[in-house]
Regions:
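Class I SAM-dependent methyltransferase SAM/SAH-binding core
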Residues: 51-96
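Conserved class I S-adenosyl-L-methionine
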Residues: 1-39, 41-50, 143
């Protein structure tokens, strides 16, 4: 089974029980950092939207959102939440519908955790970004004991990988990006935060 299929299977099997008080608590702390990078009332691609936490936050802030995920079951939950709240967004599991389109903001939250080499995914995300746009990505922070608890638990499904800030910078550079900002979440104190939140711009020279 390919890594993508492993990740899809993991989230299809967990979709019904994915949302819980712990993930909501951590997710809200991550959103506080993400909101600082994503202006309200802009167009956003939320790549790997899951059950919609980030997508719904964008929608609440007046953004026009395209939401993509490889898990049909996770995406269905996100779409149902949006409909219940009276929001409209473009939900899809078909990457072909993203081809040839670009956005000023692309968010990719909690996706790169599972890729031993994130550079190929970052290169794909670069094709969806306007030349002056911003890509917002997250990684488990290898300097945080909280992140290592998460890493330990993930080994029973699809193992996640923790990253140092230096690794994030190198991977971004390999994919043609430069770091515009790097912050921490849960807590928002460097270097203890569980999550690294990186804002990336395309390298121009």
């Amino acid at each position: 089974m390919t890594l993508v299929n492993q990740v899809r299977h993991r989230f299809d099997s967990r979709a019904a029980n994915y949302d819980n008080p712990l993930t909501a608590f951590i997710g809200e702390r991550e959103l506080r950092a993400i909101r600082k990078l994503v202006p309200p009332h802009t167009e956003v691609l939320d790549y790997g939207c899951g059950t919609g936490r980030t997508t719904l936050d964008h929608l609440r802030r007046g953004c026009k959102v395209t939401a993509y995920d490889i898990s049909r079951k996770m995406l269905a939950i996100a779409e149902a939440k949006a409909a219940e709240m009276g929001f409209e967004a473009g939900f899809t599991t078909d990457p072909g519908l993203l081809e040839g389109r670009t956005w000023p903001i692309v968010t990719c939250i909690g996706v790169l955790d599972y890729y031993p080499d994130p550079a190929p995914v970052l290169k794909t995300l670069r094709t969806y970004l306007e030349p002056s746009g911003l890509l917002v990505v997250t990684f488990p922070n290898a300097l945080s004991p909280l992140a290592w608890m998460y890493i330990a638990g993930s080994r029973f499904t699809v193992p996640a990988v923790a990253r140092t800030p230096g690794f994030v910078r190198r991977s971004a550079a390999r994919a043609g990006f430069r770091i515009a900002s790097l912050s921490y979440a849960f807590p928002g104190i460097p270097p203890l935060g569980h999550t690294l939140v990186a804002g990336l711009h395309v390298q121009t020279s």
